[in-house]
Curated annotation (Swiss-Prot):
Gene for this chain: SORCS3
Residue stretches of each BNR repeat: 231-242, 279-290, 320-331, 515-526, 592-603, 634-645
Protein origin, superkingdom: Eukaryota
Subcellular locations according to the entry: Cell membrane; Synaptic cell membrane; Postsynaptic density
Protein name per the record: VPS10 domain-containing receptor SorCS3
Chain positions covered by the region annotation Interaction with DLG4: 1219-1222
């Protein structure tokens, strides 16, 4: 889950300003933008060493170098982000910034931790927002030499403290030609700091004329800051004063922080290589107090409401708190995961001083804890989630808290809505996420980008219900890329000012195309290209073969406009860089603008420009995106239809960025740059108030209606906005509001999306997915209560439509049916089968179906102690028990209500480091005939292992030192086999079921090739597909369901075996029953041969089931001579196995063949019979291979050649230690 875009967080010093002539590489951040360049002017190196605070979370790059044309890519490589590799990149809590800023996804999922990938923190899409995460500073490095240098760009001698100014006269009203228009400006040089290669800038802009700039010299060889200067302006940047004497001439400063709730309060950190101290100012940097610290600060997190409350994270992973703005500090907790601590959220957490934090444990896991900053003792801490969680997975964002738990290699995500109990996030059953990022948590809804098991460079977009639990698909295959910091960029953009409008770049047949939605992802369409180009020539571009495509990455540099921008105070106005054609391109790009929320577009430039909003969207200012020095900018008052050219400096300036937002109220913008390669930093103050003739009046506005391809209802309402009339050069002012009137519409189909478990067929029909049973109520539905039975539709969150189809599509209340307990499970909190003697072992009891409130629970710990509960409520957080002796304990959970009961067993042991075990059993066995059962263990080189085998209801295991065992089942029915493998101090188990019958017949099945593309190759999917095939066979042939068993094999191509079983009410007339069975086989065989058996996997995917064998398979039973053909086939299997064995042994003596065998072993099935296997029949066992983990990854099962019987996966319940990486 990853941040898509967020406002400048609190507690972060600013990100870097890069001193370079290549504006493509400039990266600035408000509230202390840090500038870094190599002292030689060459390509920089990472600016933060291991001892420094880690870098600020990466802001989304405007483009990745490898995606640009070669000449641009090489230019972009001239500067790099100079940050130390951090463990996690997250949005922060609070403000701490100058002016407003919007940035895109920050943060890579951490790699290298033990327990699965963590959840990158979420942030808000579109519009300015407050984020609540801690984040350290960032550094960036100066690029290579600039392309050219002005002739008069040489440096002169200037006083160290005063700098220099250059005055530029304002033009007369209604000046002459556009090229003669000038804007009043002043230029100031930070004289004496030309050697400094980093800088941080802060200007709040809110009723303040103060600008602070911290410059410093970072020595890459020493890994520390060796010099620093602090500059302060009180006249909006006209002049600056050097403050080194006020902070201490020998004090070397490293970072600047601004309080987000009171921007007059400033914090400066000294470089820890020199000393550990903090300087505090309460008068906007005029005076400072210095305090020594006993720890080294890595990052700060200010409280979003209380201006004096601060959290400090140290380099040794300790969390400190201060309630007096850093004058005194108190240790809260140790072993805190970096960037995983959060302040309370007003209106949700009861205490304002509550802190949410993730604490690492000594065994490689983490716990989610909360405590108050002044009362964080062990007795006062709370654990809202009882189980261990993955490291770097805690996210607290708005109304939601997210965590991740990885068990048996598969991650599960949990969410708490408004601090309620955690619930597991429900994605469509077979989404199987490899990676997940939170895009947005706006408007009581979660947007999540999920990379599924069959995706590599794309993500699917899912949107949730209000509680953030049930997710449905909004768009497939959204393009992703890696940022300069390695962060994931999801190319999705929310248009500010109008809810529900998103732009997304989707990968379609290896082409990337831009789509737009007006109803939060329910419907998407391509962008219509402009009718004419910039020169007025017709553009011949017909949908869907040709359309407009946009670059949706936001700027990594808040001092550049980014490649797409919109503004809350200018609804409907979108400016973006893109191209016209069949797909998105990084060549032949221009700048396009839409005045009506993306319905229509016009081209305004034929090359790349930075375009900013002036006067809260009332005007636009543009500056060419070029590595060359510039003197002019362009201003438009009619939404880009026409532009006026203004000069802002008499000497051409290599522009590194411009600060526009902070000076919005005063109509002042600051342009940062330099006149030559070795010159000082130049800060050009541009006063553009003269371009406005007056304040706007009522007569200066006009209205416009928001439409979606002519449809006036967008997100269930009609909206009318007002905007300034084109050409009116009047100032809007801060209080300008764009919205005029809004009224609800009658609900139509496009106001509803498919509910969880349903998929879209056609334009508006939602039907259940093949894996979903809509008739099954939630497991927390108690008898006597009611639940909402979905109609398959749910109204889009924040949609305001009324009446119409609303009643038809609204979920209907139904009484909860009584249900017997089913799917009972007992697990340990960490998912492992190990407990230390004398320590707490915590058990969790789970139940798939049943009445939680009316079911009695009993848990027998297996050591003579048992506990009972009247319902599930007291045990939701787990049942703790201390074992006083070591050994094997059979822990039994029993659930019962008046409709039935269920039992679950867990075998607990103190065991060794075995990581995986795979139990291989046949699906079907013959009564009174031996069955060969084996276990495959990984890693294979573990020495002596002990195997514990449980058959059926036995309470004592059979213990062997061999990985295989033979067993005879004496009665018909379904039996359970459990194996536990112990070695050293670890124990793992696998459980499977086997059907025992007097006789059966089977047929091999194959499928149409389109099923392979949708095959994730996991047991649950194979089981569901088997059920779908069974239902299809029953429907076509009317054969009783209990006489059919389908076993879908692992691997590709997808294949299966059909077992035809005798009826349950088997009589003594066996001959007749065998005849009936053969008749059923012939009926099924004919139906399959006629292609009558098929099913729809998903909309548009129809799968046909075929018979692999051309002839009917013989009957398999307990009679030795019943079928000579069966015996011949079995003998064939034996001889083939012997031949393969000999060839394999011979191949082992030839090195290159041996290598081939090792690589290919995951495709070679073991050939063993499920019934009466010969004792002396040679076979190839999986343990012969050197890399059995490949087999376990695919969970390879074995089958008998010729279709006699099959070794395959049955439903498996595994208790395997959680051994994944985060």
């Amino acid at each position: 889950m990853e941040a898509a875009r967020t406002e400048r967080p609190a507690g972060r010093p600013g990100a870097p300003l890069v001193r370079t002539g290549l504006l493509l590489l400039s990266t600035w951040v408000l509230a202390g933008a840090e500038i870094t360049w190599d002292a030689t002017g060459g390509p920089g190196r990472p600016a933060a060493p291991a001892s420094r605070p880690p870098a600020l979370s990466p802001l989304s790059p405007r483009a990745v170098a490898s995606q640009w044309p070669e000449e641009l890519a090489s230019a972009r490589r001239a500067a790099v982000l100079g940050r130390r590799a951090g463990p996690e990149l997250l949005p922060q809590q609070g403000g701490g910034r100058g002016g407003e800023m919007q940035v895109e996804a920050g943060g890579t999922s951490p790699a290298g931790e033990r327990r699965g990938r963590g959840i990158p923190a979420p942030a808000k899409l579109g519009g300015a927002r407050r984020s609540r995460r801690a984040q350290p500073p960032i550094t960036q490095e100066r690029g290579d030499a600039w392309a050219t240098a002005p002739a008069d760009g040489s440096r002169g001698s200037r006083p160290l403290a005063k700098g220099s100014r250059e005055e530029v006269k304002a033009p007369r009203a209604g000046g002459s030609a556009a090229e003669d228009l000038r804007l009043p400006s002043t230029s100031f040089a930070l004289t004496g700091d030309s050697a400094h290669n980093q800088a941080m800038v802060h200007w709040s802009g809110h009723n303040s004329s103060v600008i602070l700039i911290l410059t410093k010299l970072y020595d890459f060889n020493l890994g520390s800051v060796t010099e620093s200067s602090l500059w302060r302006s009180t006249d909006y940047g006209t002049t600056y004063e050097k403050l080194n004497d006020k902070v201490g001439l020998k004090t070397v400063l490293s970072y600047l922080y601004v309080n987000p709730t009171n921007k007059r309060k400033i914090m400066l950190l000294s470089d820890p290589e020199m000393e550990s101290s903090i300087l505090i100012s309460s008068d906007e940097g005029a005076t400072y107090q210095k305090y020594r610290l006993t720890f080294y600060i890595q990052s700060l997190l200010f409280h979003p409401k209380q201006e004096d409350w601060v959290l400090a994270y140290s380099l040794d992973q300790k969390l400190y708190s201060s309630m007096d703005f850093g004058r005194r500090w108190q240790l809260m907790h140790e072993r805190i995961t970096p960037n995983r601590f959060y302040w309370s959220v007003a209106g949700l957490d009861k205490e304002a001083d509550l802190v949410h934090m993730e604490v690492r444990t000594t065994d490689g896991y983490a716990h989610y804890l909360t405590c108050r900053i002044q009362e964080c003792a062990e007795t006062t801490r709370s654990g809202p989630f009882a189980r261990s969680i993955d490291i770097s997975s805690l996210v607290v964002q708005d109304e939601y808290i997210f965590i991740q738990v990885t068990t048996s290699g598969r991650a599960s995500y949990y969410v708490s809505y408004r601090r309620e109990a955690f619930a597991q996030i429900k994605l469509p059953k077979y989404s199987l996420p490899k990676d997940m990022h939170i895009i947005s948590t706006d408007e009581n809804q979660v947007f999540a980008a999920v990379q599924e098991w069959n995706q590599n460079d794309t993500y699917n977009l899912y949107i949730s219900d209000t509680r953030g639990i049930y997710f449905t698909l909004a768009m497939e295959n959204i393009k992703s890329s890696r940022g300069l910091m390695g962060n994931i960029i999801i190319e999705l953009y929310e248009v500010a000012g109008i809810k529900g409008i998103f732009l997304a770049n989707k990968k379609v047949d290896d082409q990337v195309k831009t789509y737009i939605t007006y109803n939060k992802g329910r419907d998407w369409r391509l962008l219509q290209a402009p009718d004419v180009d910039l020169r007025g020539s017709p553009v011949h571009c017909l949908l869907p073969f040709c359309s407009l495509h946009l670059h949706l990455q936001l700027s990594e540099n808040p001092y550049s406009s980014g490649r797409i921008s919109s503004k809350e105070t200018a609804p409907g106005l979108v400016v973006a860089t893109g191209n016209i054609g069949p797909e998105l391109s990084y060549t032949d790009i221009g700048v396009f603008i839409s005045s009506d929320g993306g319905n229509t577009w016009r081209q305004i430039f034929d090359e790349e420009y930075n375009v900013w909003f002036l006067d809260w969207g009332g005007a636009l200012v543009a500056m060419k995106h070029t590595p060359l020095p510039v003197r002019h900018l362009w201003v438009s008052f009619d939404e880009g239809h026409s532009w006026d050219k203004y000069g802002f400096t008499s000497v051409p300036l290599f522009v590194d960025g411009a600060l526009v937002e902070a000076g919005m109220e005063t109509h002042i913008m600051t342009v940062f740059g330099h006149f030559s390669l070795r010159s000082e930093w130049q800060l050009v103050k541009v006063d553009y108030k003269s371009i406005f003739s007056r304040h706007c009046t009522k007569e200066d506005y006009q209205t416009w209606h928001l439409l979606n391809q002519g449809e006036p209802c967008v997100m269930g309402e009609r909206k009318i906005f007002k905007k300034r009339k084109p050409g009116a050069q009047c100032a809007l002012g801060r209080d300008h509001s764009g919205s005029v009137v809004s009224e609800p519409c009658v609900c139509a189909n496009w106001d509803f999306e498919c509910d969880y478990g349903y998929e879209r067929h056609g334009e508006s029909q939602c039907v259940p997915a093949f894996w979903y049973n809509p008739a099954s109520p939630s497991k927390d539905c108690s008898l006597g209560q009611s639940y909402l039975n979905s109609t398959g539709y749910r109204r889009i969150v924040s949609n305001n439509c009324t009446d119409g189809l609303r009643e038809k599509y609204t979920a209907k209340a139904q009484m909860c049916p009584g249900k017997a307990p089913r799917g009972l499970h007992v697990v340990t909190t960490d998912g492992r089968l190990v407990a230390e003697q004398g320590h707490n072992a915590t058990f969790i009891i789970l139940m798939e179906e049943g009445d939680l409130q009316r079911t009695n629970i009993q848990l027998d710990f297996g050591d003579g102690i048992a506990v009972s509960y009247a319902n599930f409520s007291p045990i939701e957080d787990g049942i703790k028990h201390v074992y006083k002796s070591a050994g094997i304990f059979q822990v039994t959970a029993y659930a019962e209500n008046n409709l039935g009961s269920d039992t679950a067993v867990l075998f607990l042991h103190v065991v060794c480091p075995v990581e995986h075990v795979h139990l291989r059993v046949p699906f079907v066995a013959i009564r009174n005939k031996e069955v060969n059962i084996s276990a495959v263990v990984w890693p294979s080189q573990l020495g002596t292992l002990t195997y514990f085998w449980w058959f059926g209801n036995s309470t004592k295991p059979l213990i062997t030192l061999d990985s295989s065992i033979s067993f005879t089942f004496l009665a018909e029915g379904t039996d359970t086999i459990t194996v536990q493998v112990a070695a050293g101090n670890a124990l793992i188990q696998d459980t499977k079921e086997i059907a025992v019958h007097e006789y059966f017949q089977s047929q091999l099945l194959s499928f149409s090739p389109n099923l392979d593309y949708h095959n994730p190759d996991i047991p649950e999917w194979r089981k569901d597909i088997g059920n779908v095939i069974k239902r299809a066979l029953v429907k076509v042939t009317s054969v009783p369901e209990d006489q059919i068993l389908i076993a879908v094999f692992p691997g590709l191509p997808t294949s299966a075996e059909l077992f035809i079983l005798p009826p349950k009410n088997l009589t003594e007339r066996r001959k007749g029953n065998e005849g009936d069975l053969e008749q059923i086989v012939e009926t099924l065989f004919n139906a399959l041969n006629q292609n009558l058996v098929q099913f729809e996997l998903k909309p548009g995917v129809q799968v046909i089931v075929y018979v692999t064998q051309l002839t009917l398979a013989p009957l398999v039973d307990s009679s030795a001579g019943h079928s000579s053909s069966a015996m011949l086939m079995l003998l064939s299997v034996v001889f083939v196995g012997l031949a393969v064995f000999l060839i394999y042994k011979f191949k082992r003596k030839i090195p290159w063949i041996n290598i081939y065998a090792q690589v290919q072993h995951d495709k070679e099935q073991e050939m063993i019979g499920s019934v009466s296997q010969s004792e002396n029949a040679p076979k190839i066992t999986l343990s012969d291979f050197t890399e059995p983990e490949e087999l376990l990854d695919k969970e390879l099962d074995t089958r008998v050649i010729g279709g006699i019987a099959t070794i395959a996966n049955s439903e498996s319940t595994k208790e395997i230690p959680n051994c994944t990486s985060v």
